[in-house]
Amino acid sequence: MYSSCSLLQRLVWFPFLALVATQLLFIRNVSSLNLTNEYLHHKCLVSEGKYKPGSKYEYILNDYIRFLAAGNFRSGSMHMTSGLKPNAVTILYQCSGDSYNSKCRSCYAAGISGLRRRCPRNKGGIIWFDQCFVEITSISVIDFNISKINYENNFPLHNPNRVSGNIKSFNNETMALLKELALKANNKDNMDNGKMALYASGEKRVGTKKVYAMVQCMRDLVKPKMCKECLESIIKEFPECCDGKQGGRILGTSCDFRYELYPFLRTSDSKTV
């Protein structure tokens, strides 16, 4: 079960005994024992208002949705933005680095369906799943700022169960792993489809157990320098988000991280380093 200040999410977790060790191992592929595409959270951007049935906004929105759905989802991220208010439309999605291609397509479809159900006729909304997030907004192409990190929509989730043993050491070791992955994600040698991957995953042995983790930035909008800044910022929130928790994550639209005490990434289509 995940929980936050205002949200409880049902997920299956494995018990963990936290022990201190120093061995750090980065892996290219992590097998998955608990592979899901669970709904995690959504946010209706009510300040953007609603659109009317049959309106020009609805026509543009549906046209963009179909256009993105016809793509190959090979890069794992995409955005489209066009027009001026009141009919400006922007759609973007980002899939997890291990869920590109067909898995990304399926998650995008789930995101669009979920937004229509949870934020009916809202001009703006964001929805997160295990494998992706999808955002729709009425921000115009002129106002859509791709050079600014968005922290407003960050949302923490964590396992309510705490690790046993030395909590301080567990926190320090897990944060060290996340920081190392942030550096890997921004390494110029970490390329994918001709662009910096801005994604990394790895595992860290702690006694007889392992902590598995990943970090990622929105590839289609976030520049490498911004990615580093974004990841550093949310990792600093670890003590408030995930202090001594058996698992946790911070969702966002510019960057995110996740750690668990079990493998949670796919072996195929993996972008791990």
UniProtKB/Swiss-Prot annotation:
Matching CDD domains: Gnk2-like (cd23509)
Query: Locate the Gnk2-homologous domain: which residues?
Result: 39-141, 151-264
Please give the family membership noted in the entry. Answer: Belongs to the cysteine-rich repeat secretory protein family.
Write down the superkingdom of origin.
Eukaryota
Keywords in UniProt for this one? Answer: Repeat, Secreted, Signal
Signal sequence, renumbered to the chain: 1-32
What name does this protein carry? Cysteine-rich repeat secretory protein 30
Q: State the compartments where it is located.
A: Secreted
Q: Does the keyword tRNA-binding apply?
A: no
Q: Is Nucleotide-binding set as a keyword in this record? A: no
Q: Would you tell me the Gene Ontology cellular component terms?
A: extracellular region
Name the major location: secreted
